[in-house]
Amino acid sequence: MCHFTVSVIVPNYNNEKYIRQCLDSILAQTYPVKELVVYDDCSTDGSRTILKEYSEKYSNVKVIWGAKNVGVSVARDTAIRATTSDYVCMLDADDYFYSNTKIEKEMQNAQKIFDQTGKKVVVFSQTIDVDEGGSILTKLKPVDLSGNERFKIVTRRYSNYMPRDYCFPREYYDLCGGYTKNLALYEDWELNLKLLQLTNFVFSGGYGTAYRHKAGGLSSVNYKIQLETKINIIQKFQISSKERICFYAIAYGAFLKNEIKDFISHYV
């Protein structure tokens, strides 16, 4: 039996089109969600009306109304620090939980490991890529990521399986320092690296979040800026020589692959 309590936090900015599906997928979870904390970052669309509706209808839904636009990292950080549960899970307002047993499966793993070792871990599931309308783009077969999670996360070896929207111990967020608030790219990966200093990541074995691909996302950011950001992040952490060599090989390989792809699309 699982004894850990769970909160889910959602940063929102002008997601009127998607916010209902996001909130409904959280409220439909088979595992009880103690708190659903939404940070609204000064939205100017109808999402504020929707959030008021949900906060009035559901006693576990709490909305933090931002006084000024602060960006997603600060929004997440503020929402996380407002939670009081044992574990916290994050979900962006334009995404949704693909499976209504997502949190239950993750917490079963967390409880099992805690009962065996007395240690709290981060538990994640695999994502499914969907387009703006919610149609599935890719539904990759779940892979066994139950081995050396540290190596895979540090080196970004499997970018399609990079842990996101996972359940993590609330106390470890404070201990690791949380989000770096002025980081514009790869802030989630940096948080992964921080949490890795304290505990292990464990794969639940199933699907979790439907990740919505929209114009203006990371894929639209200059590849050189992406590479430089990843290098600046990894240099903050103590990692092994093997991890460092593999990271640079994979990072530069991805950069060159994208540059060649762009060259071919423009000139060939």
Protein language model regions, located:
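Acidic helix N-cap motif at the loop->helix transition within catalytic regions
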Residues: Y18-R20, D45-E53
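Conserved donor NDP-sugar-binding/catalytic core segment of glycosyltransferases
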Residues: T101-L137
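Short aromatic/hydrophobic "clamp" motif used to bind/position activated sugar donors
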Residues: V88
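Conserved nucleotide-sugar donor-binding catalytic segment
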Residues: S125, K139-I233
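Cell-envelope/extracellular polymer assembly enzymes that use nucleotide-activated donors
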Residues: F4-S7, E35, E190
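A conserved acidic beta->alpha catalytic loop
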Residues: D40-T49, K68, D92
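N-proximal low-complexity "stem/linker" segments adjacent to membrane-targeting elements
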Residues: M1-L27
